[in-house]
Amino acid sequence: MYEAFFGLREKPFALTPNTDFLVQLAPYQACLNLLRVALGEGEGFIKITGEVGTGKTLLCRALLNLLDSEQYQLAYLPNPSLTPLDLRQAVARELHVEGIEQLDSMGLLDALNRRLIELAAAGRSVVLLIDEAQALPEETLEALRLLTNLETERSKLLQVVLFGQPELDAILERNEFRQLRQRITFSYRLRPLDETDANRYLQERLAVAGFRGDQPFGKAAVRMLVRGSGGIPRLLNILAHKSLMVAFGEGRRLVDKRHV
């Protein structure tokens, strides 16, 4: 609606996790660097947490794009509301294990072990990425722990990255998950953006969408956007989009605080 008015090719603040719009802010870069180094060293089990809307899914997608497909075999589970059998089937499917429908739970575990050994022999590290991991049922978390038992004398056959909301931390703190918790080698918590990062976030997303020129959001508008969103990128997107619409409706190319 307002794209042509502001000289944009597309909407800059859409809510879909498009990695073209991943802004290279320090918190995101630190998280991606941690993931790349830890996975490169075969460090096994990594947990990334953050509030709803802080960019976990976008980072997960970015990691999928960054990792070398010749070095890594990736398995991505966007919907973890799975039974233990469903989990093994989903991982087996991602790793191209054949005939999984005919296998029971133990048969699947054996088939997965063989496939993981085969991939390791070919020099490929297997990484399982689970988004919205706080939704994993308790029995499936235990099944995940058993999957991480698969190893050779030298290395783990399966590395795991969990992306989840803060509830995941609370779940893993429970006594029944202490063995799984002890396997986590690295953790990272995504924080809300401060005003400086939020301003850069707005500018870079506008630039990716085709905007050229001075920042259309005035300083007071940026402060209002940060305050209203709490620095949460998803909420920042929603408010920025609505503010552009209001300014467009008034025929104004500068968004000030009354538009927010």
Language model: regions and residue ranges:
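A short, basic N-terminal segment
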Residues: M1-G42
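Conserved NTP-binding/hydrolysis module of P-loop NTPases
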Residues: L8-F13, Q71-L74, L82-E101
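Walker A/P-loop nucleotide-binding motif
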Residues: G42-L63, P80
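A short beta-strand-to-loop transition that corresponds to the Sensor-1 phosphate-sensing loop
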Residues: E51-V52, E132, L162-E167
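Central P-loop NTPase core of STAND/AAA+ ATPases
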Residues: L95-A120
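Helix-loop-helix "sensor" segment of P-loop NTPases
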Residues: V97-E98, E118-A122, V127, T152, ...
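Conserved Walker B catalytic segment
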Residues: N113-L162, N175
